[in-house]
Regions:
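Conserved, structured core segments of small domains
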Residues: 1-103
Length: 103
């Protein structure tokens, strides 16, 4: 099944403004993860003004629906978003388990 990257550009004061919507945003993310649509998600580490969410679904609809229903988008915390198809080159459907300290 294809992968799709949902990319958020956040407002400059994202950290302060997200507090009112964070619980609902995380609930939505956990529900999508439980449905096996959302694979992983989080803020971009070099800046709190962006986020990346990776979806695994038949088409871009799951990622687009997530964004349209996300309180961060609805309330202007995410100033814009886009969904891009993502081609996985290394990795597969089977999760790898790593032991601590071993690569």
């Amino acid at each position: 099944m294809p992968y799709f990257a949902l990319i958020y550009d956040m407002v400059d004061d994202f950290v302060a403004r997200r507090a009112a919507y964070r619980d609902e945003h995380l609930r939505l993310a956990r529900e999508s993860y439980a449905r096996c649509q959302l694979v992983l998600a989080g803020a971009l580490a070099d800046s709190p003004a962006g986020a990346l969410l990776v979806f695994n679904s038949a088409d871009a609809t799951a990622a687009e629906d997530f964004a349209r229903n996300d309180p961060y988008v609805k309330n202007g915390v995410a100033k814009q978003w886009k969904v891009r198809p993502w081609t996985v080159v290394v990795g597969n459907e089977e999760p790898r388990v790593r032991s601590a300290g071993k690569d």
